[in-house]
Amino acid sequence: MIPDVSQALAWLEKHPQALKGIQRGLERETLRVNADGTLATTGHPEALGSALTHKWITTDFAEALLEFITPVDGDIQHMLTFMRDLHRYTARKLGDERMWPLSMPCYIAEGQDIELAQYGTSNTGRFKTLYREGLKNRYGALMQTISGVHYNFSLPMAFWQAKCGVTEGDAAKEKISAGYFRLIRNYYRFGWVIPYLFGASPAICSSFLQGKPTTLPFEKTDCGMYYLPYATSLRLSDLGYTNKSQSNLGITFNDLHEYVAGLKRAIKTPSEEYVQIGLEKDGKRLQINSNVLQIENELYAPIRPKRVTRSGESPSDALLRGGIEYIEVRSLDINPFSPIGVDEQQVRFLDLFMVWCVLADAPEMSSSELLCTRANWNRVILEGRKPGLTLGIGCETAQFPLPKVGKDLFRDLRRVAQTLDSIHGGEDYQKVCDELVACFDNPELTFSARILRSMIDTGIGGTGKAFGEAYRNLLREEPLEILQEEEFIAERDASVRRQQEIEAADTEPFAAWLAKHD
């Protein structure tokens, strides 16, 4: 089932320096909650500056949903320590609030009024909040409070020069983009390994079912928690953050122009369902528009091709201008065993897996084949630890035992690990392979099995409160290592100034501005 990568691995072993200079970045979302686990109803803390313009700390869907962003970094330890500093500083500024340590929220009642993230009075800020109003009216606010970690990854130019002989210019743009699309196609085929190892949402609170009937064979605990005994990541299931209405968009990952055309089609195609919502009610705007996607970022995907945008540029126009610059992996649950929601083992594994995905052959995939890959993901998401579980290849009927496929994959990853360790010294990458490959023979070692044991004992709420309290105490006590308090204060003040400048520069009423930007 695993493609034959022996030639590509032999090439890599002859060109180890091609992997010198991998760049990464992390984003982590987390809800601000009160001591009893309920959602904080306070505004974004003043000490954290402007959520619109702060470089490192912003908000996602809700005013209480923090998002931490590291700068691009070539050093794993430095990146994780930077992320930890963001958490340390924030923990000191949250008063009695703490950060929820799980992907799935708990103490949010069905229909509870969740305040949308606020970004001030500028047209840009109001647009961001209106987009979130549209998300709420389309999918419900509860789904949008699910948190995750995003891992951004790019290969050095030296890799593309050695592998594809690229120099600068348009030909390089096309070849590099084609390489990243190969990575994405392999991710769709084999990325289920991420929720298998690191999924940490095997259970949900009853409010998530919102009274809707479900065919899933949930078991229920006395405290009202629903769980599937072999599930890994219900966050990635249809109960979590996915979007069924997008599954027939026909967006593919074979070619840059084809991909962008599919994206642009989706933001221009009206949706019968969203037309029903309407654009306004009682003078209040309900969504940016009634198209399948309000804006490109609404496309739900487990992985995205990205390029840093220029001012006023859409993500797809940035891709057309310069090609794919980096990849955003979006399938990581919050790691509940880390105070910052992610750890070094995960980052090193993702490095290895991304390199493998770019080396392995990946035939082009039609949109129907892409849908077939979803079957393996769903199987792993809902029953990944089930004894005897098998996986298929694309739309074919042949089935293979998951543990065998996992161990075959790790045989390749270990060779990538040896190459990366030869560049950096030590055996850190190989050690990660040894630790994680054991999860295929013993699923009890996976994140989902470990966290489920705690959740069955104390419920999602009890687990979340206990871990959140422990991390709050730990982070508040730890000294800052990279950033200093003065730098946080300077960025707070600068971000507020930047927001004020944007607001002062606006001359157009929002309705007129929106008409031009929709």
Swiss-Prot record:
Gene3D superfamilies: 3.30.590.20. Signal peptide: none annotated. It comes from the Bacteria. Pfam families: Glu_cys_ligase (PF04262). Its EC number is 6.3.2.2. GO terms for molecular function: ATP binding; glutamate-cysteine ligase activity; metal ion binding. GO terms for biological process: glutathione biosynthetic process. GO terms for cellular component: cytosol. Pathway: Sulfur metabolism; glutathione biosynthesis; glutathione from L-cysteine and L-glutamate: step 1/2. Keywords: ATP-binding, Glutathione biosynthesis, Ligase, Nucleotide-binding. The keyword Ligase applies. It catalyses: L-cysteine + L-glutamate + ATP = gamma-L-glutamyl-L-cysteine + ADP + phosphate + H(+). InterPro entries: Gln_synth/guanido_kin_cat_dom, Glu_cys_ligase, Glut_cys_ligase. HAMAP family: Glu_cys_ligase (MF_00578). Belongs to the glutamate--cysteine ligase type 1 family. Type 1 subfamily. This is Glutamate--cysteine ligase.
